[in-house]
Amino acid sequence: MNMSNMAIDLVGVRKSFGDKVIVNDLSFSVARGECFGLLGPNGAGKSTIARMLLGMIWPDRGKITVLDEPVPSRARARRGVGVVPQFDNLEPEFTVRENLLVFGRYFGMSARTIEAVVPSLLEFARLESKADVRVSLLGGGMKRRLTLARALINDPHLLVMDEPTTGLDPHARHLIWERLRALLARGKTILLTTHFMEEAERLCDPLCVLESGCKIAEGEPDALIDEHIGCNVIEIYGGDLDQLRELIRPYARHIEVSGETLFCYARCPDEISVHLRGRTGLRVLQRPPNLEDVFLRLTGREMEK
């Protein structure tokens, strides 16, 4: 059978629970070998999309294809998919090695085959020294790396990762990112749901920005930032925001207010700084634009964590 270049294809997918629409007429495609991000706040529909891709729930309408198989009617596609859920579901009283051995049996792998791949998975997850340690004694970062290694037990073509670094400290998060880059270098395809802007910028090729189940933007991170922002950002805290807005309006491309912060987008930020000079009680931060600014620009509010 000829394989298409697309690992995932969604067309016009909608999902509701009761009267609440969770995913609304969503379409996107994920090419083989890329990391595609679903970026949005809690409640945007990211986890629901992941569950539909895995055949765990059915869409109300629309078409989903995973690895050239229609989902959920053809469960065969599931064999080529590894899953890293949002919350760890490891066996806490089993050792690291035992968790891998048991999980491999769910895929019908022989004991000999599983035992042959476990050493390389432990090395990949940097858990060789913890192989015989009970999972309940591991830290959060190690548990996430074990969950990632477990998802690779059957050498899947596609990884579906739902908020893989939520709750991790910065060091553990960066280590997961480094392992994901290694998988992409091997040609794996990754679907990544996240609300971390930095994570999306660092890992994703294209990404889809979601708000209340709707796609509000799609593209590569740098392209989205350039399209919707395209200039430096000045954050201003303190003072009378209405007064500040009027003061800097002539020198700004665009101004947003979120909470007690004024976001000013300007090609020449020095002009803004000159007019703020001498004003007391202000904290001013000048920085390059990021995906948080894109979300704020499109929705009028900051990303909720």
Swiss-Prot record:
Its main location: membrane. It is a peripheral membrane protein. It is found in: Cell inner membrane. GO terms for molecular function: ATP binding; ATP hydrolysis activity; transmembrane transporter activity. Keywords: ATP-binding, Cell inner membrane, Cell membrane, Membrane, Nodulation, Nucleotide-binding, Translocase, Transport. It is an enzyme of class 7 (translocase). InterPro entries: AAA+_ATPase, ABC_transporter-like_ATP-bd, ABC_transporter_ATP-binding, ABC_transptNodI, P-loop_NTPase. Coiled coil: none annotated. GO terms for cellular component: plasma membrane. Belongs to the ABC transporter superfamily. Lipooligosaccharide exporter (TC 3.A.1.102) family. PANTHER family: ABC TRANSPORTER ATP-BINDING PROTEIN, ABC TRANSPORTER ATP-BINDING PROTEIN NATA. This is Nod factor export ATP-binding protein I. It comes from Bradyrhizobium sp. (strain SNU001). The gene is nodI.
